[in-house]
């Protein structure tokens, strides 16, 4: 029996559909424990939709007890309205994470694609294929939002070590954290 080193929650936020995925990491091995999607009806008032996202994400966190979270940032494309709605859903999910004091790393869509596929411009099918391969799944996770959430969790495993090393380097060289890097060193944060 292998010991789980840590449990990672990946989140792909969206007002209509917020995908989530649980990845267990033991050394360099990754395994998918569960995934799903919180869907909200378009005819519900906005506040009710956000409450549903928050409550269901809080339930996922309570059930699987992740140690950390990888979440996709909002991408401002052509549709600004959609970006605002996604940002609100993202906020509801982040509050659920904050209630449990979970470490959260945020990734752009291109960072996630680069970590999972090796190319920041990869298409959705390439990401889904690699999620399936990296997690040794029999099929591509469905819906798409769940596959994207699993990709965010996988991305966390590749970036988390870098963020910690960068934080140590910031502290060692007395470099202030300007919000660009996840420097956890108090030396940098005190000077902002």
Show which residues each predicted segment covers.
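Phosphate- and other anionic-substrate recognition elements at nucleic-acid/protein interfaces
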Residues: 1-192
């Amino acid at each position: 029996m292998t010991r789980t080193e840590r449990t990672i929650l990946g989140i792909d936020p969206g007002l209509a559909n917020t995908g989530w995925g649980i990845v267990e990491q033991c050394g360099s091995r990754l395994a998918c424990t569960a995934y799903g999607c919180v869907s909200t009806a378009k005819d519900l008032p906005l506040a009710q939709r956000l409450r549903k996202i928050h409550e269901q994400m809080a339930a996922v966190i309570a059930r699987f007890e992740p140690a950390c979270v990888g979440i996709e940032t909002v991408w401002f494309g052509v549709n600004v309205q959609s970006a605002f709605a996604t940002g609100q859903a993202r906020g509801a999910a982040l509050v659920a994470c904050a209630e449990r004091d979970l470490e959260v790393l945020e990734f752009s869509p291109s960072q996630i694609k680069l970590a999972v596929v090796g190319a920041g411009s990869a298409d959705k099918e390439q990401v889904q294929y690699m999620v399936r391969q990296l997690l040794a799944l029999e099929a591509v996770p469905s819906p798409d939002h769940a596959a994207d959430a699993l990709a965010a969790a996988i991305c966390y495993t590749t970036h988390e070590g870098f963020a910690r090393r960068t934080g140590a380097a910031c502290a060692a060289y007395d470099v202030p954290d300007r919000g660009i890097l996840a420097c956890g060193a108090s030396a940098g944060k005190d000077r902002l």
